[in-house]
Amino acid sequence: MTTRRKKIYEGKAKILYEGPEPGTLIQYFKDDATAFNAQKKAILEGKGVINNRISEYIMTRLNGIGVQNHFIRRLNLREQLIKEVEIVPLEVVVRNIAAGSIATRLGLTEGQPLPRSIIEFYYKDDKLGDPMVTEEHITAFNWAATQEIDDMMAMALRVNDYLSGLFAGVGITLVDFKVEFGRVYEGDFSRVILADEISPDSCRLWDTVTNEKLDKDRFRRDLGNVIESYTEVARRLGIMKEMPTVIQGGVH
């Protein structure tokens, strides 16, 4: 039985619906694929199902090592129950290997290992193209407090350490990834926790032996076999054995 719920927000890859209890939301994973700030668009059947499973798997394990996040439980193929947070308007990117915009900006060769893991901040605004910003911008415009920045950086590096090992164990190199954070309030105090998703949509993942791309760059660069590559990531993690049978289910 399908129940209609109030839509709270719709982004490029997900929809947030009102949750069953106060302080909760339902996060629905769409099949929409976008790149270059939504200038390139397509529907990739089954992408939402795979990303839901991969993000569930990773968020559950991060919770287990003390990286608190918004994930509560998966509800069905496309949806998960999450904690409602006040999203910090920043994308936090951790880079291990030169790829994407950092290679272009700094004239680096794609695939070149960076001297150390580098954290970058981007202001979340599609109309502006998600510009890169500094800690000075973040505190000056009150997007986040200094302590929140420190907490986000510490969590991002912890996620990087864990995911680098997790993926290395299944023959995948974690090149870089993007995470988002949100505030949860407890009385007069708030703290930041990990939010959004972690999936091949938000990570650059290369096969360790061949450097074959297993992530959203396959869509960005018209390399083809996007769903097959996402499924391969899920298969190596032991989540799925084969491409999912797509069922357009869910609460909406």
From Swiss-Prot:
Gene Ontology cellular-component annotations: cytosol
EC number: 6.3.2.6
Pfam family, one: SAICAR_synt
TM segment ranges: none
InterPro entries: SAICAR_synt/ADE2_N, SAICAR_synt_PurC, SAICAR_synth, SAICAR_synthetase, SAICAR_synthetase_CS
Catalytic activity: 5-amino-1-(5-phospho-D-ribosyl)imidazole-4-carboxylate + L-aspartate + ATP = (2S)-2-[5-amino-1-(5-phospho-beta-D-ribosyl)imidazole-4-carboxamido]succinate + ADP + phosphate + 2 H(+)
Keyword Translocase: no
Pathway involvement of the protein, from the record: Purine metabolism; IMP biosynthesis via de novo pathway; 5-amino-1-(5-phospho-D-ribosyl)imidazole-4-carboxamide from 5-amino-1-(5-phospho-D-ribosyl)imidazole-4-carboxylate: step 1/2
Key word ATP-binding present: yes
GO function terms (MF aspect): ATP binding; phosphoribosylaminoimidazolesuccinocarboxamide synthase activity
Listed CDD domains: SAICAR_synt_PurC
Biological process according to GO: 'de novo' IMP biosynthetic process; cobalamin biosynthetic process
PANTHER family recorded: MULTIFUNCTIONAL PROTEIN ADE2 (PTHR43599), SI:DKEY-6E2.2 (PTHR43599:SF3)
HAMAP family: SAICAR_synth
Protein name per the record: Phosphoribosylaminoimidazole-succinocarboxamide synthase 1
Source organism: Caulobacter vibrioides (strain ATCC 19089 / CIP 103742 / CB 15) (Caulobacter crescentus)
Gene: purC1
